[in-house]
Amino acid sequence: MRYIVSPQLVLQVGKGQEVERALYLTPYDYIDEKSPIYYFLRSHLNIQQPEIVKRHILLTLRMTQLKGYLGNLLDIKDDIIIYSHKNNLEYSYVDNTIFNPFVYTQKKTLLKNDSFLYNVYPGACDFLVIWVARACDTSIPEFGSYEDVDNNIIKFETMLMEVFPQLDLDITVESKFNNIFRTNLKLTGLKKIIQRVQDLDINYKSLLSRYDEHFINMTGNHFILNDEQLNLSIWDLDGTLALSSDGDTVMINNVKLFTDLVSDIDTQMERIKGDITYKVHLATPINSRIKLDIETSFIFIETATNNILLSSDKKISIILAKNHISIKVKNHIPNIEKYFTFLVIAINAMFNSVQKSADFTKVETVYWSRICQNTKNKNRKPIIINYLDPGMKKISNNFYKSDEKEVFINDNGIMFTCMDPLGKYNKVGFLNIFHDMRKYCIPCCFLHDQSHRSTFSSCVHQIDVEKKIVSPYILNFGKVVTESKMSFLPIIFDAFLNDGMTANMEQDNKRLKETSGYHIVRCCAGDDIVRLRTTSDIIQFVNEDKNILIVNDMVYFPMNASDIGKKIHILIQEIVHEVMIVKKKESSDKIDFFPPNYKLLKDLFPKQTIQTPIQSDAGMVLTTDGFYIDGKLFNEDLSSKYVTFTKNVIASDAVAKYFSPLFKYVISEAKDRFIKTWMINIMIHMNVDPNNIIPTLEKYYPNSGRAQIN
């Protein structure tokens, strides 16, 4: 799909706010009569023929930079005030009503900001209208100012217009959302959405439930348990959760459905906030190692890694690859990913049209100073020599060895060797990070022989390294772990699961040297990434997967002890990972993984009892394991056409106190909590002696968690 850069409109107004000039800014040579800008000009301002100007306002400018640019564009040397009828720009009222310098009111506090245009004007990528007035023509001339134009901005804009005709803006946005947003969608909006689902008659299952903290409502087609008070859930025809909202957070799996539902109804939902990741595929490859030859800090900030850029406000990160661009945005801004892709493609055309290859030693020496560096007691940086010593043994076409020296010859014929004056770091090896990323063979000096390393085999013997080989470096817990990585467990679980186990690490880093067995975190369990956002999602996953799940400092079990499998999962940034035992020999980089010692956690399972009837009547039996009708477990889907709110049962202080230690550590499935509430309520109303409540509870739930705590 070809990205069309939207036209922009600049309106210069006089004393009566009459339009003196209407500038239609576009990188094209014509007016797009189908654009919203032209419709606004013709229908609302009754302007049929604006001035067509082949220029473009960069949406990355600050307000002061924008003011200087507009003064240059309109050739105004006086103080000016800029504003818009859609969004506040330079000034805003404390209550966020739209500022207009011709109808100023002193009853509200006026705020001035110098933020970035795309932040204060969220729809700027598609529809940008800026009004400009001389300050002396308004009711508040003291609020006007004059800013000099930044010549670098004009220089960049000129180059942008020159290369624009040759840009290939054919792009495809593959993934648009990371599924989690922050908004102010409340009960009114949620009710309107669920009403729309029923009006469309699309046979999607929907559920709107409201409840107090820690209790259960059984409505619709699912048991729902969240710690939030309000929840809307809608399932696709195949039973997949399409979207879910708790009134503050919206999780969207079916973007089209969500867009269709809210497109023409007033949900009272303000601007959505939350991290969003876009992956944009390019029809024409670019140079991912971008180099900016002029000042462009008003657009991007360069980082130490030459394929990563940051926006000027550092809230948007851009990772460049040859055929695609990944863009991570803090808050949702319509089409911002396409706009930044346009800028990246343009800059590539300006400065990086020819991709050059060069020897690492001549171009990327910065990496040696950071990763393979010489210090007072370590001499790890290899030196370049001009010849081989007589009698050196040929190991391969690019590697020679003697008792005193090892020599590596790269593709450009440059010879590297290690000659540590202290006699320690004399073994030639290679930096894994560059080999993994780019297949670069960057030599470095090591204490021990490196010939057993997989990277050595690839660089010296041209033996293909398995793509999914796991790095021996163990990351700190907290980040999502990829297939080639592993990380430590959280401190509390590391101490618990690895009691009596050891892992020997190399000095001064987190590289695993040797272990006969140690619990760590591996990448996502299974082939597909599983994301769990709410407590309800977590409980549903645990009972379907039938394995233990660690979330923060809590452990989730399947409902029944007999269901507990032999795996341990752990949630990191809402992604399910796997806990494994790692084993490694000191003489090899090969890492072996084994199942965890799941029994350590299984022994903490709180409900270890046989099925016991609590009460029965007319073929219905309530037991500690579920609710049965005529001997069959009741698990039928209920109708989702109606919304039902059930009054929650509140347990007595004695019961709450009894179970409180348990729920600090372990929470089981929604049905379990529902049945506990029901069961306790029945017991309390069965003429049980108040002085005998705890012994009665211990009969059905002998392991309350107190034994584990003590």
Curated annotation (Swiss-Prot):
One Pfam short name: Pox_VERT_large
Q: Which residues cross the membrane?
A: none
Its predominant location is virion
Keyword Transcription attributed: yes
Q: Which GO terms describe its molecular function?
A: DNA binding
Biological process according to GO? positive regulation of DNA-templated transcription
Q: Where in the cell is it found?
A: Virion
Example of a GO cellular component annotation carried by this entry = virion component
Cite the entry's keywords alphabetically: Activator, DNA-binding, Late protein, Transcription, Transcription regulation, Virion
Q: Which domain of life is it from?
A: Viruses
Family recorded in the similarity comment: Belongs to the poxviridae VETF large subunit family.
Q: How does it assemble?
A: Heterodimer of a 70 kDa and a 82 kDa subunit. Part of the early transcription complex composed of ETF, RAP94/OPG109, and the DNA-directed RNA polymerase.
Functional description taken from the UniProt entry: Acts with RNA polymerase to initiate transcription from early gene promoters. Is recruited by the RPO-associated protein of 94 kDa RAP94/OPG109 to form the early transcription complex, which also contains the core RNA polymerase. ETF heterodimer binds to early gene promoters.
Report the protein name in the record: Early transcription factor 82 kDa subunit
Q: Which organism is it from?
A: Vaccinia virus (strain Western Reserve)
Gene label: OPG133
